[in-house]
């Protein structure tokens, strides 16, 4: 409820919450809690409309801020039990396609929700194979995957050929501003989804926090593990949009990347992502500085006069 209310006050009206790599018992508890919270929506903050199952089907070599003690090969029954406990709230499942059993996993899960490549060592050919099996999305492009090079384009190169949507962390820390501009130019403003990957330090002061059972230190807005690995973000989505525009992304493109594009990626665009008849009455009124002046959620003013 605290997260929802904070996001709502920042201008975020809908969010899809990401998990981390944990044991099945913990993830089923998280899934159940998400289902209960979503059912109790009172339009006082951002609506929780889905879950991104970010872990545990990852490469340990590209674990990022995930704990490797929970990382396992793709397991459909594991996913199914967590999703059942959530009431089918899982909208995306992340997977490293080079892992044992990954392609069979993608075949099955892609019939139920989006499958996204993430935390991977996959090369271009493996990524293309994954797309052919049903992957359609890329989680936080460039981060926790091999870099794009002219002889080894990797996941990034495969995404430019096949992905329906790619995510971009636009906090000014995970991705260089020039790369942000390049991604919008290459992929177009219909495919890019701005994400925050914000963790519990978002909206709070610098200091020591925790993420997935690991200590995280936030200094000058940058969140890292003890070894210096970037550990999520302390920046909310609304600020990511403002930074994208500051970096040179056209305002209309940045706004699409934070509204209808992610709604389509999560397959919840029938209820949110744009102002249309039959959809949620979620409206954000901003000035030229993109700072909210009034926020309407479910037809109810939750910020501004």
Language-model features: where?
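Active-site gating loops and adjacent loop-to-helix segments of metal-dependent hydrolytic enzymes
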Residues: 5-14, 59-87, 129-141, 152-165, ...
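Active-site core of metal-dependent hydrolases
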Residues: 80-206
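Divalent metal-dependent hydrolysis catalytic cores, especially in the metallo-beta-lactamase
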Residues: 2-30, 46-59, 86-98, 114-116, ...
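His/Asp/Glu-enriched, well-ordered alpha-helical/loop segment
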Residues: 157-167, 184-196, 201-286
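Short, compositionally biased
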Residues: 294-302
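Conserved, mostly hydrophobic/aromatic
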Residues: 7, 53, 109, 138, ...
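Generic structural signal for well-ordered alpha-helices
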Residues: 3-4, 28-35, 79, 106, ...
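Short, electropositive alpha-helical surface patch
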Residues: 27-42, 105-114, 250-257
């Amino acid at each position: 409820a605290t997260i929802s209310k904070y996001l709502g006050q920042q201008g975020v009206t809908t969010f899809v919450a990401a998990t981390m790599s944990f044991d099945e018992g913990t993830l089923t508890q998280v899934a159940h809690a998400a289902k209960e919270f979503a059912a109790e929506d009172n339009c006082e903050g951002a609506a929780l409309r889905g879950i991104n199952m970010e872990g545990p089907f990852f490469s340990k070599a590209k674990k990022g801020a995930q704990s490797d003690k929970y990382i396992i090969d793709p397991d459909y029954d594991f996913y199914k039990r967590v999703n059942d406990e959530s009431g089918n709230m899982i909208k995306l499942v992340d997977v490293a396609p080079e892992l044992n059993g990954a392609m069979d996993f993608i075949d099955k899960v892609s019939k139920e929700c989006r499958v996204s490549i993430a935390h991977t060592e996959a090369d271009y050919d493996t990524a293309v194979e994954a797309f052919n099996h049903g992957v359609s999305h890329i989680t936080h492009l460039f981060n926790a995957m091999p870099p794009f090079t002219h002889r080894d384009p990797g996941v990034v190169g495969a995404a430019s050929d096949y992905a329906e949507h790619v995510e971009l962390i636009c906090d000014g820390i995970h991705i260089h501003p020039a790369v942000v501009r390049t991604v919008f130019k290459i992929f177009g403003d219909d495919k890019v989804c701005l994400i925050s990957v914000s963790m519990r330090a978002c909206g709070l002061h610098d200091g020591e926090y925790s993420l997935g059972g690991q200590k995280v230190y936030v200094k000058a807005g940058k969140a890292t593990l003890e070894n210096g690995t970037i550990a999520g973000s302390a920046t909310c989505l609304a600020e990511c949009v403002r930074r994208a525009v500051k970096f040179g992304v056209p305002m209309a493109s940045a706004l699409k990347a934070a509204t209808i594009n992610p709604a389509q990626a999560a397959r919840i665009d029938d209820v949110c992502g744009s102002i249309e008849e039959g959809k949620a009455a979620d409206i954000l009124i901003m000035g030229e500085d993109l700072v909210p002046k009034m926020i309407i959620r479910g037809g109810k003013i939750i910020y501004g006069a």
